[in-house]
Amino acid sequence: MAGENYCSVCEGIISTENDLAVCYKCKEEIFHKACGKKVFDSLRCLNCGPIEKRSLSHQIGEISKGKAKLETRTSRFTGINVTKEFIESGEYGISKGDDDDDGDYVGGDDSSSDDEYFGNPTVLNNYPTTMNNVDLNFPTFFLLNEDMKKRKQKIKEDGNNEEIKKIEQEEKMIIQEYQNEEILKFFGDRSCFKQTQLAYEAMVQCLKDLKESIERMFKVVSVKTLGDISSFISMSYPKKSLLDIRDIALELIGQSIDDSIHHIPTSILYTSSSSPEVAQLFQSVPSNVMMRIKSHQPFSSDISSHLCEPPTITLNPDCCNTFKSTVSTICHSLTKDYDVTKFPSPHFEDLSRWYSNYFSIPLIQEVIELFKQQQQQQQQQQQQQQQQQQQQQQQQQQQQQKDKLEEIMLVRTPVILVIEDFETWNSEVLSDLIHLLSAYRHRIPFVLSFSISTSADAIHKVLPYQVVSLLNLKSLHLRSQNEMFEQLVKHLFLKSQPYIISKKAYLYLYYNFKNSYMSLSTTISVLRHFIIDHFLENGLSYLTLDLSNFQIDLKDDDDDMDGCSTIKLEPENDSTDSTVNDEVGTGDNIDNDNVSTHGEEDTPDSLVKSDIECQTLSYSSDDERNDYDTSTDSDNCSNFHKKKPNSNNRIKSDLECNDNDKDNDDNDNDINENNNNINNNNNNNSNNDDNDKDSFGPKRIPNQRFVTLIQKLPSLNTDEIENSKISTNRKLNKLQSNLIIFKESRPIMLELYYTILSKFQKSKTLKYSELLKKISLNDRKSYETLRKTILTNPESKQSIETLLDLLKTSRHHFERIIKATNSLKLFQTPKSKKYQDLVKIENLILKCRTLSNNFKNLLLPPDEQSKSIKNEIKQQQQQQQQQQQQQQQQQHQQQQKIENEQKNWSIKKKREHQLRNIQKPTDSYFKIYSREFLDDIVSVIIEDYLYPPLVSVPLSEIFDFTQTVFITQSRFNFHTAEGINDNLIHSVRKLKCECCIDSLCGTMDDFSISFILLLRSGRYINYFDWLTSFCSIINGDNNPTPNLKARFIKSVDTFVSLELIKKTRKRKDHFEKIAFLTTS
């Protein structure tokens, strides 16, 4: 039956009310929710221990039942391949998501905080989360011997900690052995469970990172609004003297005239529906208000902070539907963190005493103590100066102390009440609440905050004028949902994230936000479900690899922390000799396969001073020199061409790479000219080669081709490859580091492209969300327009010099690219189309690094700039001179022919010929170099980094698998009107009726017949014509019978209740369409 909950242990119905049970040890009565089958043998209270002991037979039955569930609901090797129904069932740590029906970003109840979108997911129920932890669903506690338990209790009483640790280790060993056996029963192979655990942990980490990034975004966005509302709340009530606060706390005086003049301070927050910014805003309000109040207090540096921090509660109309429930909610929410026995009844009289005991009186006592300390210090100073007149001044000082103490003015700490969904509140309940708060505002300084999502006159529609006159209103406008969506896009794409959102997933988020719900909370929910479905529906993800040793530190110029970017590659379980630690800016080669980087340190000064010719590229081994040929083109971008391998040679695995391979590598001559500078580094590091061989020798994968490893990278099959083997493979380490470099530098390219496109085209309306949509749709109009403007119109107002000045302001982009790309390690890939993208990534990283270093020439002074540019173009000039010599010879021959012909030409014709052949002034070296540089920036960075699909990048974390996106979309595509339309028109498909056809016929359902006739009419339909058509289709006769009339009226009433049609006032016997109905 609906509404009943079933026990997850024995499938019995759980009682809705708490049952009384008896603790078997202390015989005390306790409350316990139990199922109807009474499966528990005994129960312990909290004083005797929280463990619930169950029968042995029941535990064994539970394990078999959980095994059956996993076998029916899993596939492949993941262990948690979950369907839509399985996710919505709320099992295995994935909540159904009912708390998001209202669209709020943060839930209102404390009890549901664990099920919120950004709470930590619950522990997987049917298998342990780690190999060492114990899950209560596994019957491990009854494995321990009773003698061991008794011995442990005696040792605890004696206080011998060493023996307690020994017993705990013995218990862990017993539990571990039993767990391993049960894991093998559940999953077969232990590695399968291990990778399932890694997928779950990676999913939790992604959700945690998403939560933290969104919280940072809200803090940045709501700074102005937070300051306005905090200043309004902190100074909402005037200061009162210390004696007045004391008399109010002791209930010696009532409400004064000044209190009646000052109304209840009320802030109106105009927000869109279901805005998550409101909840995030009021999480930061108390601390901000506390700092402001503390600064206005006397002795502000010494007053306790908790006395100035305002208590804040949120009231929801669903929980506060009556006045009594509203008052009790306020009282319980404010006093729940204090001693409840002092305030047993939920009434405002107790609430006023609560405020006096915990805020007013402690504040007065603390101020008096601080005042006494200050007076004592002053007296000591005066006694030293004036010892003779001491007796005469004592009487005067005592009178002055009383006067000063009475003159001290204090700021009372307000109590904030947030009213959510103001339009849905009952006006009578809200009016009574405001009258009650107004009566007690001289005892408790209440501050209200209304969250309004409609128009400004909503407050006058809900509340009468007399109630509104009791409020001191201040309007505050929060940012719109479009602005919040723009900020969300910046945080997801311009900040370093552990995942990459694919084009397909982004387009779904964008179009649903713009066209469907316009709610940021729903967008975040969809994104979170994309992450969950990705890990549950697919195989082992790239994010589940242990990349803790792969760290790239890429800081912006705005960051306070300094330091170069580093990528550390340290395989697990390695000795100190085999540690691979590559830092940017050092030329140390610890591993023979590592690539040496720049000899200078990676600092901004050294980057500017270094020259392009000093760039060095070393290969991982001589083995790779045979497979790659590097050449330098005119654009100074290193391109790698794969050489044809010998037919006799095979691609060897790490185990087959012997020392004999190096004998054949000494004769290699196809090396780039830049490698001439590497020989010194190789000679210096030749002594370390033998150590590197020994350190990596025993950790190579036996009987495993490296090609097979690469094939398994997009979705790692954990039955064949273990994570430990992957982490110790040197070539995979190189590949992973290059992919991390590519992923970390992609936001820099996007930000640079946006800067160029927005400022160069002077498009103020350009947004990141729109730009990403064009990139996702592969719309190249903006890119082609920008490229044509740079190359074909160099003499326009927006000249090359203007764009170069713009790029100089974006200097930090190029410095960050250098930091990221200097740790590149060349990767040896097989000659196959499957691995061409890996070579493209390396070439692209090298090109970007070269372009970034070339950019340093544009930052030099004019004299040095011209020298460096001339040196760069010198090679091009030599080639041009050869071509010019050939052209001059051809022109000389042509001129001789023309001179012979010009003898008979007229003067006019000769002048026209001279004007045509006037040589145009050649561009300067600076323009030539700049044009080529900008062409490389636009074509290489923008074209190669942004527009290609992310699927072509191996091991990039994408959420656009067809099955996953379809499952996620099915949860958030709520097209109610379209569903009703389709079901009524094609009712035959839904009912699966064999006697009917999928078109209008008399055997169809009455609702379908009348609905199709409604769609064929215009905006209005006559009732009698509609009835006549209905009867003609069923009987073939236009005369309606009483039976047909009753059936037709039932259909019409159903359409009216669904708000598809309504009666009209002007036209009698007519109905008007309300909803947008279409034929399909």
UniProtKB/Swiss-Prot annotation:
One GO cellular component term: DNA replication preinitiation complex
Q: Which GO terms describe its biological process?
A: DNA replication initiation
Compartment list: Nucleus
Q: What is this protein called?
A: Origin recognition complex subunit 3
What the protein does comes down to: Component of the origin recognition complex (ORC) that binds origins of replication. DNA-binding is ATP-dependent, however specific DNA sequences that define origins of replication have not been identified so far. ORC is required to assemble the pre-replication complex necessary to initiate DNA replication.
The subunit structure is: ORC is composed of six subunits.
A single Gene Ontology MF term assigned here is:
DNA replication origin binding
Q: Where is the composition biased (Basic and acidic residues)?
A: 651-661
